Amino acid sequence: MFRATLAICGRTVVKRQFISSVSGESALPPNLRLPPNLIGVAAEKRPPPSGSDLPVVRRCEADVPAHLTPAQTWLESLGSRDSDQLGVVDLHPDVFSVPIRLDILHAVEVWQRNFKRISYANVKTRAEVRGGGRKPWQQKRTGRARHGSIRSPLWRGGGIIHGPRGPTSYYYMLPMKVRVQGLKIALSAKLAQDYLHIVDSLEIPTPDPQYLQDLVKHRQWGDSVLIVDVGEEFPQNILKATEDLKTVNIIPALGLNVHSLLKHESLVLTLEAVKFLEKKLLWHDVRYTPLYPFKLPYSDLP
């Protein structure tokens, strides 16, 4: 009975795949929602960078381990709506190709939401509620239950026991290595999902927000885009274009964090931002090594 059922199910799957291949329809369930860049036309025409004839515009400045190879992606420009590739960019594998650890991502995300959280919930005890100083009735000869105050927790309008006594801080710290690893994992996940885009600069021809919206829609960058560049001063056109857009945000590379990466669908980095992130994140792997030659426990210095 089990073999017959397995054979029938197998034939059904093969039949569905054959019909979908002939008719051009998708064999996936209709209620399955996939990101548009995985099933769109632009993604189908996107060849792997390894087989490209375009020159390698950027090489990894830091030494790449012998057992690893640099990750590669396209270099694009924001000068036009068309996604013309200008070249190939090498990305350090220790930053953009680390193994995905969802537990670390979750730990960093929860920490980032809670380490500044303060709860101001506060309730009054029976000693703080107004009134209740007089005994409501005598102890005996009334037939009622004995009570000493109308502000007892047993009474309606009385004090609260074991209630919140704010302000309460939820502050705690994660180790620096865990936070750095979480940022590496988030960057690697964006690259693996084809959500990472490298541009030469943030110069756009017009400050019109519609131009940026059309560019994002034409290149199928998703519903939300995070643009990252170094420094605190950005081109005026990109600032004015993103000023009134809720789905396109721009931040400096120094403020890049796991929460912002998970909140936005696509990530756009400039070449200078890639250089800054690689230098900063790789530095954490070897920081204070001369001070700890015997591999002592990690410690931060002031």
UniProtKB/Swiss-Prot annotation:
One GO term of the biological process aspect: translation
- Give one Pfam family: Ribosomal_L4
Q: Where is the signal peptide?
A: none
Q: Name one GO cellular component term.
A: mitochondrial large ribosomal subunit
Q: Which domain of life is it from?
A: Eukaryota
Q: What's the family? A: Belongs to the universal ribosomal protein uL4 family.
On subunit structure and binding partners, the annotation says:
Component of the mitochondrial ribosome large subunit (39S) which comprises a 16S rRNA and about 50 distinct proteins.
Task: Provide the protein name.
Answer: Large ribosomal subunit protein uL4m
What is the species of this protein? Danio rerio (Zebrafish)
Lineage, uppermost ranks: Eukaryota, Metazoa, Chordata, Craniata, Vertebrata
